[in-house]
Amino acid sequence: MKIIIGEGSCGIAAGAAKIYDYFAKHTKFAELSITGCIGMCYLEPIVDVIEEGKKRTYCKVGTDILPEFSKALEQKEFDGTLLKSLELKEEDRAFLEKQTRIALRNCGIINPESIEDYIEAGGYQALERVLREMTPEQVIETIKISGLAGRGGAGFPTWFKWNAARQSPGDQKYLICNADEGDPGAFMDRAVIESDPHNLIEGMLIGAYAIGACEAVVYVRAEYPLAIVRLTKAIRQAEERGYLGENIAGSGFSCKMRIKAGAGAF
């Protein structure tokens, strides 16, 4: 059995860290892991349980019922009253299953603090293919054909921006990711970085290769401490596995990455 605790900011605010600590201390019958936000913040804390290949999702798991919840899992009382009352409702499951996720495909699925989980989900394959098989110009053309555009009001074409950066004069070029969100209640960037930081790193490296940059910077809000912690860990893991730094994947392309935390706002 594997127990996975949803530990995005929303889950932690609802008590997920206490749930993880309880299972870490009292549970010996299951493997324990974490994941990010799957997008149903209103149902946190969320606990996924995988048993014999079947995944069950339990919602609003309060810290006050942890002893009973843990005992029911240990005894595999999946059809019992307690577990059935906490299981994800069909209408919520339908809400998820109708979605086609691209940038969010791994969020709430993999462990955001594990590069092994990301690689197992197909991570860094696109980067390796780009570095092995494509020129920077071919990458930009592929982005042009895809129709990828900025998510701001202007919908600015990504290929145009990358192409302009590549053709601009200067030996030293930088790729900057703006993960600062000033709109009240907005946390799209936070959700991605907290739940799938290696996805951001891989995308930035492909962009850096396309424009000829040897350094990438992520500007993150100081109010996103968990995002900063997980991205810092992901950068270190990518460096250790050879996906960041000198001669990435033996391609001759080199790029380093760093985080710049914002000064905070009021």
Language-model segments: which ranges?
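Feature of Fe-S/electron-transfer and energy-metabolism proteins
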Residues: 1-266
